[in-house]
Every structure is written in structure tokens, then in C-alpha cells.
Regions:
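N-terminal auxiliary interaction/assembly segments of multi-subunit proteins
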Residues: 1-155
Length: 155
């Protein structure tokens, strides 16, 4: 069992990559809630790191945070984004974090395909948890949650 990256490390990893790829500023805004409810969110996307133990990377955003993320990744105005762009952006964010986490603590794991949570499920049986709330873009008020959870007995 490896120690999960801290919320601050998750934010730093996302910031380094997003600055290089999209010119998008990401800052740490605190820890996000434990668990991954899909309710009251515009979109919640997960990417598994398949192996033992099983890790799940999760990104979620409300309308404002999702639009800011999509705007940065697609180089357009926030009002020109749509639900598909938001989901694509969250999938990309999950893949970015999954690749970084794999290199940090799960080199033998395989990165699974991103998928969207379409109901109000909460991930249960979490052994370890680390989650960061990120401020996205230059406005300072758009937020996206990114988290990693470790599960025992899977993989």
C-alpha cells in the first residue's frame, strides 16, 4: 500500500500539467468532501487505476466550474461551452491526474477508460482518501473537485 498524494500535491500536479497544455491556472482551494456523490453536480467522471489495490480518480464540477474548465481546454468563452465539452474536459482532467498518480504510486497499474457517473452513487469501502478542491482559470470563483480513493480487496 502506497501513501496517496496529498490534496496539495494533487493540485500541484494538475496545475503543472494544465499550465503547460492549456495555459490554465489551477490553484488549491482546500480539501474536498470525502466520497464522490454525483448529486447536484453538472458532471462526475471517474477513471480507474486497475491493479491491487484499486484506485479511482474522480473529477466533478458544478455548472460554473465545468464551464470554466471547458472554456480553458477548448479555448473559448464560458458561455460558448456545452455539457459535452464539460464532460470531455472532466475526462481529460481525470486522465491527466491518473497518469501522474500512476507514475507516483502505481507504476504497475493500468489506466482504465473514463466514464461518467450517471446517478447519485457514492463510492463506499474506501481505505484511503485524498481530495482537492481546485480553483480553475482566472476568475477565482470557478471550482472543480479532483480526488483519488484507494479500495482494498479489488484489483
Amino acid at each position: 500500500m502506497s501513501e496517496l498524494p496529498s490534496p496539495e500535491t494533487l493540485a500541484s500536479v494538475v496545475d503543472e500539467t494544465s499550465q503547460a497544455m492549456y495555459g490554465m491556472a489551477v490553484t488549491f482551494a482546500g480539501e474536498c468532501e470525502r466520497g464522490m456523490p454525483g448529486a447536484n453536480q453538472n458532471a462526475t467522471v471517474i477513471v480507474p487505476l486497475i491493479g491491487a489495490p484499486l484506485y479511482i480518480i474522480t473529477a466533478r464540477a458544478d455548472d460554473h466550474g465545468g464551464s470554466a474548465l471547458a472554456s480553458a481546454m477548448f479555448s473559448c468563452e464560458t458561455q460558448d461551452t456545452n455539457a459535452e465539452m464539460v464532460e470531455d474536459s472532466l475526462r481529460e482532467l481525470c486522465n491527466i491526474v491518473a497518469g501522474q498518480v500512476k507514475s507516483l504510486i502505481a507504476q504497475e497499474h493500468e489506466i482504465g477508460l473514463p466514464s461518467r457517473l450517471t446517478d447519485d452513487r457514492t463510492l463506499h469501502d474506501v481505505h484511503q482518501w485524498s481530495g482537492a478542491r481546485l480553483r480553475v482559470g482566472h476568475t477565482g470563483n470557478a471550482e472543480v473537485d479532483i480526488a483519488i480513493a484507494e479500495f482494498e480487496g479489488f484489483g
